[in-house]
């Protein structure tokens, strides 16, 4: 989304059940199709687990038992431990290069882990993709395409072969598309493999969240504005993408929450930020229901030991909800 920094914010969301929207301490579950009953327990509730953050984003669960997420305006990455404790995992000093000092959003955004468990970061303020090494230093994986600076990398996902896919809208630039520091004439979806950066998609105006299907045959990418779309692309054997098709169009849907982060579960259901909260889609693109929150949602991530808890970051808070199906996570 438009904010990418580090902050300690976790939203515990427990799932709500029953045919009618059921309200919990953090929100409610809107059930639109009986298929949702196989995903969300009947009496699950959305739980708010932490609050007081400044636009938390990019959550990722670390296997040793904690959640990391960016607090974009504060330029920090926060660490939340079940039980409620929040600490700073990576402070502003990691994001205070000259570029970030004049950025519209100075810190990190999307976060993920590679096969070695190293944190990989969309450092949107510094317009680059970095990796946090075991000794604490940051390695720049990429900051340019054909010699031109990225706009402001937003979200990212690893494929099982180790290649990294990411989106690059202009939200981190002070004037976004009209910013004089913008070097690329488009907002792209890119792939990093073997140290090489490849442009995959350039016809989306503001690509944002992205996630693979369980078999990695498809890559889902949403477009935040002005057209609010969830797109699906066939992944070719060489890792590039075929032509995109519209998976779901939000054109006629009211609400200020544009598509942002997304995740997929092991059965192929998609959980995508959208108007009112987290929209849940079947693999065929049927809208099964919505996790409705009073705050604007930015992203989500699978957590806990069994991978069945969906953590949600929103305007100032962290939520979670316990589901029946485990998610795909790094």
Task: Show the residue positions of the predicted features.
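Bacterial N-terminal signal peptides
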Residues: 4-15
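Sequence-structural signature of mature extracellular/luminal beta-sheet repeat domains
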Residues: 18-330
């Amino acid at each position: 989304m438009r904010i990418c920094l580090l902050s300690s914010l976790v939203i515990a969301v427990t799932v709500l059940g029953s045919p009618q929207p059921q309200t919990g301490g953090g929100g409610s579950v809107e059930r639109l199709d009986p298929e949702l009953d196989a995903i969300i327990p009947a009496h699950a509730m959305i739980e708010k687990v932490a609050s007081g953050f400044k636009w938390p984003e990019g959550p990722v669960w670390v296997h040793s038992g904690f959640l990391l997420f960016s607090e974009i305006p504060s330029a920090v990455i926060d660490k939340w431990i079940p039980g409620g404790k929040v600490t700073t995992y990576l402070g502003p000093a990691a994001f205070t290069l000259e570029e970030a000092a004049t950025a519209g959003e100075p810190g990190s955004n999307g976060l993920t882990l590679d096969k070695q468990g190293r944190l990989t970061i969309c450092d949107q303020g510094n317009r680059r993709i970095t990796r946090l090494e075991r000794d604490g230093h940051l390695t720049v994986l990429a900051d340019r395409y054909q010699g031109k600076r990225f706009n402001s990398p937003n979200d990212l996902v690893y494929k099982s072969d180790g290649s990294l896919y990411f989106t690059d809208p202009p939200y981190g630039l002070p004037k976004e598309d009209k910013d004089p520091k913008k070097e690329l004439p488009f907002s792209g979806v890119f792939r990093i493999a073997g140290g090489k950066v490849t442009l995959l998609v350039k016809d989306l105006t503001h690509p944002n969240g992205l996630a693979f299907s369980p078999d990695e045959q498809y890559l889902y990418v949403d477009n935040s504005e002005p057209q609010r779309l969830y797109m699906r692309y066939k992944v070719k054997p060489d890792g590039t993408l075929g032509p995109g098709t519209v998976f779901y169009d939000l054109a006629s849907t009211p609400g200020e929450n544009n598509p942002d982060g997304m995740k997929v579960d092991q059965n192929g259901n998609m959980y995508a930020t959208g108007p009112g909260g987290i929209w849940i889609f079947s693999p065929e693109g049927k809208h099964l229901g919505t996790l409705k929150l009073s705050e604007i949602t930015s992203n989500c991530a699978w957590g806990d030991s069994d991978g069945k808890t969906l953590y949600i970051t929103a305007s100032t808070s962290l939520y979670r909800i316990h589901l029946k199906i485990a998610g795909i996570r790094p």
